[in-house]
Amino acid sequence: DCAVTERYGRCICCSRQQASVLSYHNGALREYLSEKLPEYMVPQNYHFMEQLPTLSNGKINRKQLREDFKEETAVIRFSKATTETEEKLLDIWKQLFGYENIGIEDNYFSLGGDSLIATRLISEVQKTFGCKITISTIFENLTVKSLAKAIEQSEQKEEDTLQIKPNLEEAYHPFPLTDVQYAYWLGRSGLYELGNVATHCYFELDADGLDTECAETAWNLLIQRHGMMRVIIQPDGMQRILENTPQYHIDVTDIRQLEVTEKEKALDEKRAEMSHQVIQTDEWPLFDVRITKIEDQKHRIHISFDNIIFDGWSMFHLLNEWAEVYRNGKAEMPITLSFRDYVLGLEQIKSTSAYEKDKKYWEDRVETFADAPDLPLAKNESQITEQRFCRRSAKLSQKEWQSVKDAAGRLEVTPSVLLMSAYAETLRLWSSNKDFTLNLTQFDRKQLHPEVNNLVGDFTTLTLLEIKNAGNNFAERTKAIQKQLTEDLEHTAYGAVELERELKKKTGNMRGAIMPVVFTSGLGVEQWNEGKWLGKLNYNISQTPQVWLDHQVVEMDGCLCLFWDSVDELFYPGMLDEMFRAYTGLLHTLAVHPEIMQEKTASLVTAEISEKRRQANETAAEFEEKTLDGLFLEAADKFPDKEALVTCSRRMTYREIKEEAFYISGQLKSMGIKKEETVAVFMEKGWEQVVAVYGILFAGAAYLPIDIHNPRERVEKILRDSGTRIILVQNQAYDQDTEWLHEWDCISVSG
């Protein structure tokens, strides 16, 4: 006898034990059914029973079946280890997957395996067996039995294996930023287009009956426990953990007496202020926590994190830990290992043979590397001076998400890759280039020490993933993505930030965003769990410099949360809404009808959306090729004596600006300025800025505006990184403690 039922979207085959069934284990039974059934109909789990529960009328009691079915993904009757290697490896799998009943025939992907678990598995195998395996080894040997054989046949070697030790004596000495941190730090400087914003994340939590004093005490205990909550970034680009910091005070605003509309206005104003903050990095703290008391028992917690020091896992971990400390009244002891120890350990990797091998792997592909998706833009990046990110969000229910994960398992790809493939499928409908590169954000903690997983910090790594429009159907394209990503993840010693520098050199796009379409997977890291937080999530948004669109996926309470954070000003009105509807619609369809993955003509969009996409891509038009300085000269010829500029110190006509700008142009040419060479404008706001910019353009050079209020070290960094040798200054600015500028050739603009 047999019954098939469903729990959270998983197909469960329940059978009364018979001789013909007892001889099967999970792997063999699945293999047999795979030969008889379409892939999407093969049950994911098998539950053997002595007797099927029935109702009084003799029919099968399906409700009781679901209650009897245990929440393990693995089967109850499983194949046990037969060798020492299998036994040790099985223990590792149980630890990583969190299941006790795992057999040596159980499938890695069916258990929920992904690339993050694979990374940890590689580390554990190296510790236990003293051999090096790769992600490809795991994905080609998806059972304990098969992987154990691969381990036994591998070479026992430990070259280039790094371990780190806590250095307590130098714990508060400066240390370098990681490559990703440094990219974030430069991105906020304004040196690049779509810069001038911090890498930032903002949360709002609604809490009932919050004790604000206890919340503040708990937050301060976390500050004592985690060194990176006491970090600053010095003007020279080094970071430093402070040994001691003042008691952090959480500002509490009481709006209980306000009318409903006034309360909403006050909360909106606070969100507008905090959701896109650019926190000063050379001053502590690099976070901002406030509380609004809305009613006697209702509070809203506002949390602003600078992601240059906290990655996604770290933020979720802090929110979990904050609530735990709040309820228990105490925090665990400070961690011996520090993020400084970890970063210095990463620096050692650059001197290994693995780094040189991975560098060659990536640099050999630079010349043929695919561009980012070429999406229709309403504006050029350079036209946006202050970008604001907007969020679109959707959710897959527990049942839908489990169904999608099961579909990924049957396809033998990770859930992240399946989501990434659906994202790419959507982008391809709007992008003019069908082969493109996505920028993947990952939280990769290299297991250099047992305490690494207890640290908070920015462990973010980036991977540039080329996605080809190859394959007859969605399933084939998804498996191709899995294959490419698997290969790429075996060459992570050389980072994507370094690769982007090489790509910028190839394209000549030194100031623009080169890979601005991002996919961020939070799967496999600490889940969003509102039950563990101080309050229920009310709102959340993130931003990153030089990013157009960032798609983030995270699990919360068994559901899948989907977020698109985007610079909407870049795109045509309504376009991103249509794209997001197409994407989420595909995922909902996949959850109900996973068989469409095999269809050659599967369509993601309705005819209406397809037509709008076609219209959005019709961007061909005739434009006059006019430049900023060319337009000015036209106006100066037409209206030479018309007033063009008014400041508090001077009024100027077009003729006067033109004459003074040509004078500056002549000075630059006499100094040997080259076409498209960068000339810095280092001034307070004033008429001199206008003259300086036109003077530079008339000379055929490019101008680089620098905020005069930036710290000296940052200005010097920008000047050196941009290759600038000439700076235009004002008399008053040049006289104010700027002797250090004498390293460069300076021209003073004065009336």
Segment roles from a protein language model:
Residues 51-54, 237-238, 295-296, 380-381, ...:
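Short, internal active-site loops enriched in acidic
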